[in-house]
Amino acid sequence: LQSSINEKNPLELKKIHQDFYDALLSKKFIVDKFVNEIELVREWNKKLIEDDNFYHITINPTMNCNFKCWYCYETHIKDSKLSDKTIQAICNHINIVFNTYPNLKDFKLSWFGGEPLLYYDTTVKPILEYAYKNFKNTKVNFYSTFTTNGLLINIDRIIDFKKYSVNFLQITLDGFEEEHNNVRYISKNKGSFIQIVDNIILLAKNEINVTVRINFSENTLLNISKLADFFSKIEKKHLKYLLFD
């Protein structure tokens, strides 16, 4: 890879590692210089907009967060959260989609932030409950996903996730325990690594899919293999619910 970068020629990579080159090519990381990528994006976007089989909403229930990661690009707004009026408007929108998309097969509700679980009971749960009940006993496949730091997950929320068709969460670790706790800490003397790992394991045991996204640097890469020890307590039958990215 370094050789191809230095030579500014991806064909150098093909000579060294054919499989890696083919993977980059198939995923469009490597694109022929004659391909109009802007036009391709426009075509994909048009196709998505016109697809009445699938509808996807992403909601930021708050721009506040319980961490202050140094690299975060979000502007945290303390105490910000969806108003009752906005929650009702979202529910109305979901109902309109259901009634105006006769070919609708899949409805995906994604939660982002800020930290989407921060005001879960008053913002997220009412919408989740409404959407689930709206699509229950219909031909539409409803499901929901979260991008979360994982700290606020507990068994009560997992029960809700199972009940309301939450089938996927993405949770980030900043490397191994020491590195992670230097970035994501609960207080001056308490890190978050152990609690988040335990929550990830709890999700897997309850058969909810989790992608563990690992942020890495030169320092975190040195200890990255130690992460496996923390997840060794998971039964083999539950490992299929974990993906490391």
Descriptions of predicted regions:
Residues 51-52, 56-87:
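Canonical Radical SAM [4Fe-4S] cluster-binding loop centered on the CxxxCxxC motif
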Residues 91, 95-110, 119-245:
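Radical SAM/AdoMet-radical enzyme domain recognition
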Residues 114:
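Active-site neighborhood of divalent metal-dependent phosphoester/pyrophosphate hydrolases
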Residues 1-22:
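Short amphipathic alpha-helical interface segments
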Residues 65, 69, 111, 171:
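Conserved, mostly hydrophobic/aromatic
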Residues 16-58, 102:
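N-terminal [4Fe-4S]-dependent radical SAM core
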Residues 47-51, 62, 71, 137, ...:
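Short, charge-rich binding segments
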